[in-house]
Amino acid sequence: MVNQQTLTLRGMGCAACAGRIEALIQALPGVQECSVNFGAEQAQVCYDPALTQVAAIQAAIEAAGYHAFPLQDPWDNEVEAQERHRRARSQRQLAQRVWVSGLIASLLVIGSLPMMLGISIPGIPMWLHHPGLQLGLTLPVLWAGRSFFINAWKAFRQNTATMDTLVAVGTGAAFLYSLAVTLFPQWLTRQGLPPDVYYEAIAVIIALLLLGRSLEERAKGQTSAAIRQLIGLQAKTARVLRQGQELTLPITEVQVEDWVRVRPGEKVPVDGEVIDGRSTVDESMVTGESLPVQKQVGDEVIGATLNKTGSLTIRATRVGRETFLAQIVQLVQQAQASKAPIQRLADQVTGWFVPAVIAIAILTFVLWFNWIGNVTLALITAVGVLIIACPCALGLATPTSIMVGTGKGAEYGILIKSAESLELAQTIQTVILDKTGTLTQGQPSVTDFLAIGDRDQQQTLLGWAASLENYSEHPLAEAIVRYGEAQGITLSTVTDFEAIPGSGVQGQVEGIWLQIGTQRWLGELGIETSALQNQWEDWEAAGKTVVGVAADGHLQAILSIADQLKPSSVAVVRSLQRLGLQVVMLTGDNRRTADAIAQAVGITQVLAEVRPDQKAAQVAQLQSRGQVVAMVGDGINDAPALAQADVGIAIGTGTDVAIAASDITLISGDLQGIVTAIQLSRATMTNIRQNLFFAFIYNVAGIPIAAGILYPLLGWLLSPMLAGAAMAFSSVSVVTNALRLRQFQPR
């Protein structure tokens, strides 16, 4: 038995921290899998409860200097309020540190200008540059940035290094040298070392890093806006009918089987079934479907949707954490906390990044000191290398884009189950569309019935056929039963019923052995169908599904069944083709019927006469040719194919089994969601590549420049203050670029 637990993490300063936590959790006995997401500040852990417990995992994380606790319930208003208060307090405290350090740093820079420029500046007294005064002003700045040093010490005790290590070593080295100059200036001069102090550089660096961290925290908070928006859709109260009275109750007190009244203009508070009234309901906020949906007695309604025109009384069927909206929130949370395969590259880099930077800084100091013997130059370049390096940008490049992308998908009624699914969707080459319920409405109806014999015999045959099909759950069977009932027939008892998947059904009705199924299957049973062959072919050529009715081994009638195409089917097929994708239709219908329907929607490749148990094999066959395949379906018999496909896309109007087997779910059932999901995946992955490019180029270019590579050519060195500014804003730029995805709109 394996349990899964999502933990919220606090205290991570960069991606190296996330990698460190992931490694220590993986090393615990009983932990089978662990994924730490720096952007989401969460860890997903799969563990064997017989070998370890959540408390032990938390203790290990706490021992490493971080904080961990189980993911809080987002539906708990009190917990949510506490989290908002905590985040607001944290941002307020960080802002105060930014202001304090910024003001003092400005004063230190102003006081240092005459010394740096070598001239007297009116209005700036020279005593402002006194080392003792600057030391006193720098100490509050170090206190404001104490988290860098505390986290660096924690990392050192664990024999590891993080971004905080780079900051602490860089500013710490500059501070200790400046302190030595302040306390022992003459001794340093006798040693041939310049009596220069770097207090203003230290203060500016810490102020800029704190500013960058403040902006980063604010931006990261915006990436989870989709979750907060979804939760905000839920009604706060409900009008519940109990003992003949209408009571206005908090939504948390509504129970299953309660009768709930919803007036025009009010939100539907819970999932339920209409038991009285008629109305139109706007479901766009949950499903993405723009047109209001008619609702009447017997129809299902979704909590958080908006009742438009009439008054409804509904029977609550799902409340609290079981509602459709709650399940959406849970899926989006899981997707945002998951890790995309492309993240592995950044994880591999951040694993050795900090030690490599420290080594480069030491080498830089040694080379410059040995080359020109100038300790000031050597110190400036070494500190610059330590300060400019930024593993945070690498760590944020992928998770922030994933969080925004999955949240944006939810806005369009597209549930993406994991970051891997979102990444895979942009590589799709072939899209297989199941015909029934995907390209078509999924509500087939009998259009023609032709029987051998007089009217009485026709009615008898229709009654037998409807009776036999009444034992089947196939959509075509339901169509035949509905047609029979509309003709006024009475259903009979059936014995020895048997369903042959992909072929038909058989059984005894009133002592007659009856078979209803495809022409191929009837032929395999030795039943001659030539008497009605011409009509059979004509109906199939018109795109209709035709089944034969045989009694005691002889064909007696045929029925044609049609399922209307969805209004969006033709446009969606064209859109997929414009995206450069190969579109394939899969159906159990015979070749003539399948070709007629495919031609109507513009599909040229058809997989016809495919039994339900063969669908997964058809997907595998396309994959064996090197194709990245997406399967779109809605029924139970589509589940194996959805699981086999590289990306399984379930129509939300279908079965729970199909949805569970899929990677992406289209809540509204609108096929346009397929196009939107692929476009969103491509936009997200483009955004991630941009982020990774910026992060890599920034470090690849920034570190050599800070090390002084341009000095021999241009005589210019990068100031540690500029290095600090560049490092601070590199992470902010990555998060800001990820937030651009919030402007995504399908084309």
UniProtKB/Swiss-Prot annotation:
Please cite one Gene Ontology biological process associated with this protein.
copper ion homeostasis
Membrane topology term: Multi-pass membrane protein
Keywords of this entry:
ATP-binding, Cell membrane, Copper, Copper transport, Ion transport, Magnesium, Membrane, Metal-binding, Nucleotide-binding, Phosphoprotein, Translocase, Transmembrane, Transmembrane helix, Transport
Catalytic residues in the record: 434
**A GO cellular component annotation in the UniProt record:** plasma membrane
Select a single GO molecular function from the record's annotations and give it. Answer: ATP hydrolysis activity
The answer to whether keyword Magnesium applies is yes
Which sequence ranges are marked TM in the entry?
Answer: 102-122, 133-151, 159-179, 200-220, 349-371, 379-396, 689-708, 721-739
Decide whether keyword NAD is in the record: no
Domain of life the protein comes from:
Bacteria
Catalysed reactions, semicolon-separated: Cu(+)(in) + ATP + H2O = Cu(+)(out) + ADP + phosphate + H(+)
CDD domains from the xrefs? Answer: HMA, P-type_ATPase_Cu-like
Q: Which residues are exposed on the Cytoplasmic face of the membrane?
A: 1-101, 152-158, 221-348, 397-688, 740-747
Binding sites annotated in the UniProt record for a metal cation? 14, 17
Q: List residues binding Mg(2+).
A: 634, 638
Question: Which EC class, in a word?
Answer: translocase
Do you know which InterPro entries this protein is assigned to?
Answer: ATPase_P-typ_cyto_dom_N, ATPase_P-typ_P_site, ATPase_P-typ_TM_dom_sf, ATPase_P-typ_transduc_dom_A_sf, HAD-like_sf, HAD_sf, Heavy-metal-associated_CS, HMA_dom
Q: Which residues form the HMA domain?
A: 3-69
Q: Where in the cell is it found?
A: Cell membrane
Sequence similarity: Belongs to the cation transport ATPase (P-type) (TC 3.A.3) family. Type IB subfamily.
Known function: May play a role in the osmotic adaptation.
Protein known as: Probable copper-transporting ATPase PacS
Query: Which organism is this entry from?
Result: Synechococcus elongatus (strain ATCC 33912 / PCC 7942 / FACHB-805) (Anacystis nidulans R2)
